[in-house]
């Protein structure tokens, strides 16, 4: 039987580009401090998918597959992956000599134990739904035997949206939130205070992947800092002040007006990342009264997304109806007829048809992410004008994120998608399908059929058609309101060198202080 091979060197396409620029002397040492607006109440390697947690965990935790600079899946902890001709077996040859932070060498037993744990405990365990079993014929070979064709399996293994982190066997047997923060990354855990900071230090035993340079979330990664500290500073003005005072070297989510001021500071630099994320409004489809599709459709018809996004982002946005960006091959217009309709007459008609009696609708938001707070404020007023009884609840981000994963206690929740729109449709599978559906529409037959087609189709055109059907259904049933595409102002010390912005993730390897 012939097999297709994906070698480690595949996708490392930026090395030549880097070589074309003058060499810059990298410097080892120093303590890097970055500030972000929100934290996380879990660092469990298999139990979180938020952007805040990803920034904190990315330098510690690693996976078999990663995405490169162009979001193409490439091997990382694996040397190569071989795919059977019928697509029913994936054979990973592991890199030899890869060390965990404990000094123990990673073997196939650790990989199997990690995936077993992920498949049992992770909220995103649908990644493993097509896997029949995992074989480990020797210490450096792992074979995934599939129940059925799953054409996006490698894409999902590579996605950082919900990482399938490899941890030691002895950690994999522990319950949620009881593991030590151990993996194979270039930095290792030092300390964590959930409300204030995470600190990591350079892992001196790190075994970098072969190659000339880092590439996306893989390639040859080098830890230059002695330590990296991620500080949680919720107020934007306080983050900016800390940067100006030299207390931190990097901040994200800088307000537009503050960014303009920072641009005149010779000691600082500002990078504009647009698009950077997609603000959304989640809608609980099983909690009354938003379990009424007509009511959801009425609210969607009333909203003016331009007004919402202008307030949420200080004007740093683009209107976009799709859950992927316009340059993505899966971009389509299925959701366009439902987007930013702003039609009061139509909305009132749908509201009357829904039989809505003024029951309270609980809308969750938080001030950690100002775009979530501002978007909720504006949308709540638009919906009140329609005659909807909105009750706004302002929580901290970790509490809000936890509550929005429960089937009761809320109706709407201001949130955002960071990595998913950048990576593509397969990263939405965990959010828009089955038991992990973000709006709890786990028995929607249209989504079930479309995702099944997406996973079993070998032709790109067939997968595009399936994704178009998915986007149309999400919009028609109003499980999630897509608000638009937002930008992110990143500000940093001018002597922070090597930093490259990457949508949905902050990379602190191959970065140093001059």
How would you label these PLM feature ranges?
Residues 79-124, 137, 143-145, 242, ...:
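Aromatic- and charge-enriched surface segment that lines or borders ligand/interaction sites
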Residues 38-54, 77-79, 104, 149-162, ...:
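A structural "hinge/loop" feature
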Residues 101, 145-163, 182-238, 259-277:
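Aromatic-rich, solvent-exposed beta-strand/loop patch
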Residues 35-85, 116, 182:
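N-terminal lobe/hinge region of extracytoplasmic solute-binding protein
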Residues 187, 318-353, 369-372:
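Structural transition elements
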Residues 29-39, 79, 89-92, 111-114, ...:
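Short, well-ordered beta-strand elements
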Residues 32, 50, 193, 197-198, ...:
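Detector for C-terminal structural segments
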Residues 27, 93, 126-171, 180-193, ...:
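Surface-exposed binding/hinge segments that line
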